[in-house]
Each structure stands twice: as structure tokens, then as C-alpha cells.
Amino acid sequence: MNIRPLHDRVIIKREEVETRSAGGIVLTGSAATKSTRAKVLAVGKGRILENGTVQPLDVKVGDTVIFNDGYGVKAEKIDGEEVLIISENDILAIVE
């Protein structure tokens, strides 16, 4: 991938969602919701504070994160893959 996010932006790729229930039933519609887990592909240099210093991001490339899938999420196709460009503020947790 040849893209670098700016400031506190993070590029993530959504994890695949299981489309079958534990009993083998194929899930469709609202039962097959999009995953809010993703792999971090790239991170910006950090948030610029009021005093001009840069605060590095808490997430790093390779982290698996849980994110808020709402306002502020921008989907793009890069190298044929759909990725999301979000602010670090939209990341709720790092999965360890």
C-alpha cells in the first residue's frame, strides 16, 4: 500500500465477519452486521497540540483495534482493497 495518513489519522482494514451462526445458519441483513474490529495498516505522525508539539499516536501498524463505525469514517479503495481512514479518536480499544 502506498498511502500515508496525516496527523492523527489511521488507515485500517476491517476484519471479515462470520456469516454463519454456530448452528450453521447463514446470517443475512442486520444479523450479519459489519465488524468493528480492524487491523491497523498505517498511522500518521500524531496529533498536533496547541503549543505546536506533536503527540504520537497510541496505536501502531499491526495492532488489532475496535473502532466506532460512525461519523468520521471514510472508506477508500486502495490497491483493490477497501480500507477505512479514521481519526485515532474513533478507536475505542486495542485488542491484546
From Swiss-Prot:
A Gene Ontology biological process term: chaperone cofactor-dependent protein refolding
GO molecular function: ATP binding; metal ion binding; protein folding chaperone; protein-folding chaperone binding; unfolded protein binding
Alphabetized UniProt keyword annotations: Chaperone, Cytoplasm
Pfam families hit by this protein: Cpn10 (PF00166)
Subcellular compartments: Cytoplasm
SUPFAM superfamilies (alphabetical): GroES-like (SSF50129)
Top-level taxon in the UniProt lineage: Bacteria
Entry's family note: Belongs to the GroES chaperonin family.
Quaternary assembly: Heptamer of 7 subunits arranged in a ring. Interacts with the chaperonin GroEL.
Protein name: Co-chaperonin GroES
Natural source organism: Pasteurella multocida (strain Pm70)
